[in-house]
């Protein structure tokens, strides 16, 4: 009997209710279902007064999940998808994202598509789209103090009521750059429509093999977003006396001290999205973010 995963946002009543329907339909279709909570993919925030420990990003893999899982259905919003990515990517498990949240930018299907979903799943008619993910590591000397996998971005910024930050950033073998700003964002193409977009960064189509560095409120007219190859590792050195906050995928992360450095590199484990139909990125931008909509009504051609 093929094994499949069901990752649910247990904090949302609609997701929990929908999970019961999905589990029954999957079992009736001949699948063994391993149901887990998306909370297992949440990172949490480390205590700034205690020494951080790193269990590696594999620690987010749920109990009962292994490489024999054919696919996992994810029920929730975009935050749930980001958590599920950390739970599945290390094992190479494809995810089918079903929106029970709000915007659903990362959703492939909706609750109104249930019949269509099961028709494709039972017939195993789908394609896989691979999205770049990142490994983010906080290093002190040769020791890794904290590590996580992320799909969208890593944001490193000042705490409230502290002064502007200074960063020295090295991209691959290029000359290091100095940035003075409230923070910096290192994002994937998937993350280019998230925090980076709000900070003035460009939208990047998901198939581009690049990463993006975006300053947050920089104190320079010359400081702008930079796009570069995703084969280039990035090192961020905090050049400021105060501790900084690092947030991964908008949910949680850790504190970074002046003696630490942050390493970011492309992960060997892309996030695999199941596509039931052609995924047209520009149409998603139009529908979800209003990109490319006409500002005036077009004349009737009839």
Curated annotation (Swiss-Prot):
One of its GO terms (biological process) is NAD metabolic process. It comes from the Bacteria. Disulfide bonds: none annotated. Its cofactor is a divalent metal cation. It catalyses: NAD(+) + ATP = ADP + NADP(+) + H(+). GO terms for cellular component: cytoplasm. Pfam families: NAD_kinase, NAD_kinase_C. The active site is at 78 (proton acceptor). Its EC number is 2.7.1.23. Keywords: ATP-binding, Cytoplasm, Kinase, NAD, NADP, Nucleotide-binding, Transferase. InterPro entries: ATP-NAD_kinase_N, ATP-NAD_kinase_PpnK-typ_C, NAD/diacylglycerol_kinase_sf, NADK. The keyword Transferase applies. It is found in: Cytoplasm. Its main location: cytoplasm. One of its GO terms (molecular function) is NAD binding. It is an enzyme of class 2 (transferase). NAD(+) binds at residues 78-79, 152-153, 182, 193-198. Involved in the regulation of the intracellular balance of NAD and NADP, and is a key enzyme in the biosynthesis of NADP. Catalyzes specifically the phosphorylation on 2'-hydroxyl of the adenosine moiety of NAD to yield NADP. Belongs to the NAD kinase family. NCBIfam families: PRK02649.1. This is NAD kinase 2. It comes from Prochlorococcus marinus (strain NATL2A). The gene is nadK2.
């Amino acid at each position: 009997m093929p094994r499949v995963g069901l990752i649910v946002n247990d904090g949302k009543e609609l997701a929990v209710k929908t999970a019961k329907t999905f589990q029954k339909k999957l079992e009736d279709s001949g699948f063994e279902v391993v149901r887990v909570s998306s909370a297992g993919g949440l990172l949490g925030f480390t205590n700034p007064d205690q020494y951080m420990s790193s269990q590696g990003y594999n620690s987010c893999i749920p109990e009962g999940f292994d490489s024999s899982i054919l696919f996992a259905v994810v029920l929730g919003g975009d935050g749930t998808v980001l958590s599920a990515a950390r739970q599945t990517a290390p094992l190479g498990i494809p995810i089918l994202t079903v929106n029970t949240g709000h915007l659903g930018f990362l959703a492939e299907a909706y609750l109104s598509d249930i019949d269509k979903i099961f028709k494709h799943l039972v017939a195993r008619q789908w394609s896989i789209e691979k999205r770049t993910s990142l490994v983010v590591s906080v290093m002190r000397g040769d020791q890794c103090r904290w590590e996580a996998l992320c799909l969208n971005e890593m944001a490193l910024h000042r705490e409230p009521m502290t002064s502007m930050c200074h960063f020295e950033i090295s991209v691959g073998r290029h000359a290091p750059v100095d940035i003075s700003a409230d923070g910096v964002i290192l994002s994937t193409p998937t993350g280019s429509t998230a925090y980076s977009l709000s900070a003035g960064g460009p939208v990047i189509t998901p198939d581009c093999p690049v990463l993006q560095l975006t300053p947050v409120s920089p104190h320079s007219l010359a400081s702008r977003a930079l796009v570069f190859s995703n084969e280039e590792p990035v090192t961020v050195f905090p050049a400021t006396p105060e501790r900084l906050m690092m947030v991964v995928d908008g949910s949680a992360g850790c504190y970074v001290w002046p003696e630490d450095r942050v390493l970011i590199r492309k992960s060997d484990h892309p996030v695999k999205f199941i596509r039931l139909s052609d995924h047209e990125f520009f149409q998603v931008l139009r529908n979800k973010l209003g990109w490319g909509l006409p500002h005036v009504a077009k004349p009737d051609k009839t």
